[in-house]
């Protein structure tokens, strides 16, 4: 990938790379990666194809031509002031056809954040109305997890994803989780939401299979979506037992790790 894109690099007057064009998915996706002068783009460029493949396996490929701007940022000043309180290893935010990324220093956390936001971007491209909140974030968590797992294998590292702190006291029921319209505000409650959203998305993908799961995403990602439970019952013949099974999948069993 890097060799193929070698002729697509722009240079500043000092010879420092500031922008690189990467083409993915058989040239159906063009990604313009930009960064301040002197930035080492190698970690991002090594991770980008892995993260994009992980996201595409979940959501599918957007209609070409698809263009994405990936802006690599230095750590903002407020993080320097708060460094004594907490350490952010990587963060990113997707808005339209742009992702702003601070890659940090941990390659697995970079892979997770990039996979998470690329999944959001692919959902935005394929389903502009967006799925329900729980599914939107559950998919993004799946994409991030898959990217981190692949990156861990390429680096021959172990990927540890322990359960969130205080999970047991902040869990949602299935009805509560799928009824959320806004993000939880408390940190422990938010961590439970993301964990459970990923667990529910994983359970549905396992039960439906990858192709039917993508069909499910499309059917609920419309301006006036059907009740997802009725949809599962009528199209995929889910029974009361199946719904109870789903409810159990978002509750951590003894010794169970991150989904």
Task: Map each language-model feature to its residues.
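Short, strongly hydrophobic alpha-helical membrane anchors
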Residues: 6-7
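Juxtacatalytic substrate-recognition/specificity segment
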Residues: 17-132, 226-230
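N-terminal signal peptide c-region/cleavage motif recognized by signal peptidases
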Residues: 10-14
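Acidic/His/Gly-enriched intrinsically disordered linker/tail segments
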Residues: 88-95, 109, 127-259
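N-terminal export leaders
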Residues: 1-2
């Amino acid at each position: 990938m890097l060799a193929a894109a070698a002729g697509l690099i722009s240079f500043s007057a000092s010879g420092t790379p500031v922008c690189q064009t990467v083409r993915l998915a058989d040239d159906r996706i063009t990604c313009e990666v930009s960064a301040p002068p002197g930035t080492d783009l190698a970690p991002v460029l090594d991770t980008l194809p892995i993260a994009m493949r992980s996201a595409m396996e979940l959501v599918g490929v957007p209609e070409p031509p698809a263009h994405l701007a990936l802006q690599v940022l230095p750590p903002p000043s407020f993080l320097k002031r708060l460094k004594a309180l907490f350490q952010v290893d990587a963060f990113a935010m997707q808005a339209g056809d742009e992702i702003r990324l601070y890659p940090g220093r941990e390659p697995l956390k970079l892979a997770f954040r990039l996979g998470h936001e690329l999944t959001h971007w692919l959902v935005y491209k394929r389903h502009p109305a967006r799925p329900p909140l729980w599914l939107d974030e559950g998919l993004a968590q799946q994409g991030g997890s898959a990217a981190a797992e692949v990156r861990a294998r390429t680096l021959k590292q172990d990927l540890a994803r322990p359960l969130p702190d205080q999970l047991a006291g902040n869990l949602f029921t299935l009805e509560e989780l799928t009824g959320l319209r806004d993000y939880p505000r408390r940190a422990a409650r938010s961590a439970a939401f993301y964990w459970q959203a990923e667990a529910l998305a994983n359970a549905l993908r396992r039960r439906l299979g990858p192709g039917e799961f993508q069909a499910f995403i499309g059917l609920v990602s419309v301006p006036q979506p059907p009740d997802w439970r009725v949809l599962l019952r009528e199209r995929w013949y889910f029974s009361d037992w199946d719904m109870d099974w789903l409810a159990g999948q978002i509750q951590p069993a003894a010794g169970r790790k991150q989904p």
